[in-house]
Structure formats: structure tokens, C-alpha cells
Amino acid sequence: MVSRFLMAEYRHLTENPSENFKVSVNENNMTEWDVILKGPADTLYEGGLFKAKIGFPPNYPYEPPRLTFTSEMWHPNIYSDGRVCISILHGDNAEEQGMTWSPVQKIDTILLSVISLLNEPNTDSPANVDAAKSYRRFVHKEDLESYPMEVKRTVKKSLDECSPEDIEYFKNAASNVPPIPSDAYEDESEEMEDDTYILTYDDEDEEEEEDEEMDDE
């Protein structure tokens, strides 16, 4: 069952590529994916190509996957071992903690959420305390050099660890491939609802016209 879900999602991502990330599957294990996330434009992470792995549990999609960066990261919500602390990937006691994982979440939504997190960290519950402290000093203009310097170091390191093929992929994607919007699935559902309304409305109009014709007769 897990493989069926993952095959469908992987097919969707390969048929609708994004300039923001690249995914590949472990041929020997469908539940392990390799990912490269592109640092968001106009942020300290711009230009970085950060590698990560996604691991899917046996009961996916009813339990969230795990995303772990293999590239070195300097961020308040990323542990030193690369694990990401973000609500969308929390499963245990999610309802009690106000977390947002649900089986309808898609992989592209997860990846775009992680990319967004890079520039919008949550310092209230940091995974990396030192990075959180440095980020706060940066935001409050107490130290404008330390945090950016560490981030830019990881950006450079991520590029050094990327293959020329991966770098070329993102260069081409930036000019040829539109990004996948994070609300793509919501838009599709809204369109379906609109179409249903139009059909229902037209049917009612036809019934009213028929009634009027009968009255005239």
C-alpha cells in the first residue's frame, strides 16, 4: 500500500517538476528518497543546493515521513544531525500539540514548507539553540555578521558537495520550469466545487424554463 502511494506521488513530481527541488528514488527501497532543496531567492540561503533524505514509515500516509538534511545546515529549527523540526512533519500527539500533519498532505507541500522555513524560522521552540541565539541577535541588529556568515558558509559547502549535473539541472529549471504552488491541491478542489455549482445552477435554470413553457401553454 505504501509503495502504491509513493509511486503515485513520485510520478506526479516527475511529471510536474519544480525549480525549487529535485527528488530521486532509491531503486532498492521505494521508501527512501533523495532530495535537493534550492535555497529561496532573496534570502541568506539563496544559491544553496541542500541535500536531504526522506524516509517513509510503513503506515504512510497516516504517519508523516522523516526529512533529514545530509548537507550541513545552520538554522534554528534544524538539529545538528540534520533532522528538521517543523509542524507538518509531526505525527505523535499532533492534535494535542496543534500540529498540522494529515494523510492528505503531499510531498511537494512538505518540501515547499521546509524551504519556506529556511527564511522564516521559529525561535520559540528551537532545535539548534546556538543558531537560534545567533539568529535573534541578527534580527535585533545586535550582531549582523555571525549568523549570515555561518549560513553563507553552508551555502558554499552545499555547492561544493553537489555534482555538476545537479547544478546544471537547477540552472535549467530556473528558466524553463515553473515552481509547483504550495496550494495546488486546494486550487484543484476549488475548481471542482465551482464546476459543480455551475452545473447545478444550469440544471435549475432549465427546469424553470420548462415550467414557464408549460404555464404558457
Swiss-Prot record:
Highest rank taxon of the organism: Viruses
The UBC core domain, residue ranges: 1-160
Keywords recorded for this protein, A-Z: ATP-binding, Early protein, Host cytoplasm, Host nucleus, Late protein, Nucleotide-binding, Transferase, Ubl conjugation pathway, Virion
As to how many cofactors bind and how, the note says:
Binds Mn2+ ion which is required for highest activity. Can also utilize Mg2+ ions.
The answer to whether UniProt assigns keyword Nucleotide-binding to this entry is: yes
| MF annotations from Gene Ontology | ATP binding; ubiquitin conjugating enzyme activity
Q: Does the keyword Plastid apply?
A: no
**What EC numbers are recorded for this enzyme?**
2.3.2.23
Q: Which cysteines are cross-linked by disulfides? A: none
**Which Pfam family is one of those matched by this entry?**
UQ_con
Reaction(s) catalysed (UniProt annotation): S-ubiquitinyl-[E1 ubiquitin-activating enzyme]-L-cysteine + [E2 ubiquitin-conjugating enzyme]-L-cysteine = [E1 ubiquitin-activating enzyme]-L-cysteine + S-ubiquitinyl-[E2 ubiquitin-conjugating enzyme]-L-cysteine
- Region: Disordered; residue ranges are 173-217
The GO annotation for biological process reads: protein ubiquitination
Query: Record's Gene Ontology CC terms?
Result: host cell cytoplasm; host cell nucleus; virion component
Cell compartments where the protein resides: Host cytoplasm; Host nucleus; Virion
Composition bias (Acidic residues) maps to 184-217
- Name the predominant localization: host cell
Q: What class of enzyme is it?
A: transferase
User: Do you know what upregulates this one?
Assistant: Expressed in the early phase of the viral replicative cycle.
- Pathway given in the UniProt record: Protein modification; protein ubiquitination
Assembly notes: Interacts with host 40S ribosomal protein RPS23. Interacts with host translation initiation factor EIF4E. Interacts with host E3 ubiquitin ligase CUL4B. Interacts with host RNF138.
Q: PANTHER family, from UniProt? A: UBIQUITIN-CONJUGATING ENZYME E2
Q: Which family does it belong to?
A: Belongs to the ubiquitin-conjugating enzyme family.
Q: What is this protein called?
A: Ubiquitin-conjugating enzyme E2
Q: Which organism is it from?
A: African swine fever virus (isolate Tick/South Africa/Pretoriuskop Pr4/1996) (ASFV)
